[in-house]
Amino acid sequence: MRQALPLVTRQGDRIAIVSGLRTPFARQATAFHGIPAVDLGKMVVGELLARSEIPADAIEQLVFGQVVQMPEAPNIAREIVLGTGMNVHTDAYSVSRACATSFQAVANVAESLMAGTIRAGIAGGADSSSVLPIGVSKALARVLVDVNKARTTRQRLTLFSRLRLRDLLPVPPAVAEYSTGLRMGDTAEQMAKTYGITREQQDALAHRSHQRAAQAWAEGKLAEEVMTTYVPPYKNPFTEDNNIRGTSTLADYAKLRPAFDRKHGSVTAANSTPLTDGAAAVILMTESRAKELGLRPLGYLRSYAFTAIDVWQDMLLGPAWSTPLALERAGLTMADLTLFDMHEAFAAQTLANLQLLGSERFAREVLGRAQATGEVDDAKFNVLGGSIAYGHPFAATGARMITQTLHELRRRGGGFGLVTACAAGGLGAAMVLEAE
């Protein structure tokens, strides 16, 4: 094992995560229908600051992410600062790393803390699948640019006459990888076939996720980390994730048809994450700054790792690549973990990564490591359910996982937890957290 890389400031301060919060997550076009991501971000950051009672000027930086970009608000982070009553001089910028976006936001704030340029910051992300940037065809876009430069009505009419009826149709956001043309579900199907993952195994994992999430809500474990939201017309509060199927049975999952490979596939809408709206954020500080403000941290960031692999085959293997690196940098092994939380983009993707984490062959032949990262104990794995149940607002999921894992570690008396996710473009992310 290589030498650990401690995440501390020049003064030896650890990176503390003092609090975290999220909105309830809503299926596309339900509770947050018509609410843009920037407003969801304002909701969660405003409430997080109000609950923490931290002086507004104590937050020196806000790093926020959004995957489904809205042209009218390209820097969502700055809009959140301006829309929540934060100090107008607060540094704010936006990041995007697909499904690992808020992992990146947390890493960026942590690096600012370690560099000594700030002592406290907020990281998070928000996405809306209900408010989408509907575009126009390339032909219409080109004509509109040319029309804007045309000098006469005749020139404008000539330009418009080149268009066909189909050129006027709206163009929804792309759901496929730009470089390959493959949808995420196509990659999940690849992985199911490559690693021999059956439909029954996928449905069982999805069912487990929903059952665990429903139980977590029923036992009140999520109440402290999920805010109550009010949206127009402000008649009813929205308080809980609305995708969780607590009363479903395995027989219900078996009824669904494959969603991507219609003839021979095994990936369905039920064993995949749904399109979701929501936001999540965490406050990070140096350990000494938290003490100055009289705050007890939820926990500490022990290490993180980001990886990238080829996109043409089985590209959602980010956790299998980033997990050993994050553990190594933390000076830990899989056996040292109290909790292991993996983003469930698809049941097939999740099961494939779990399989490879325990594979000696994958470790030697692909990662170039002497031994496997280690089998993941089912008693430690996604103990409160995962993204298949909660939903997946792309940029918010990492912050949800971090907050949820730290709260659960505290309930268990402390320990180490690892959170990890795959992401579009063959990217992966993992973070090791510590709670006392």
Curated annotation (Swiss-Prot):
Principal subcellular localisation of the protein: cytoplasm
Keywords, ordered alphabetically: Acyltransferase, Cytoplasm, Fatty acid metabolism, Lipid degradation, Lipid metabolism, Transferase
Pathway linked to the protein: Lipid metabolism; fatty acid beta-oxidation
Record flagged with keyword Lipid biosynthesis: no
Record localization: Cytoplasm
Enzyme class: transferase
Name of the protein: 3-ketoacyl-CoA thiolase
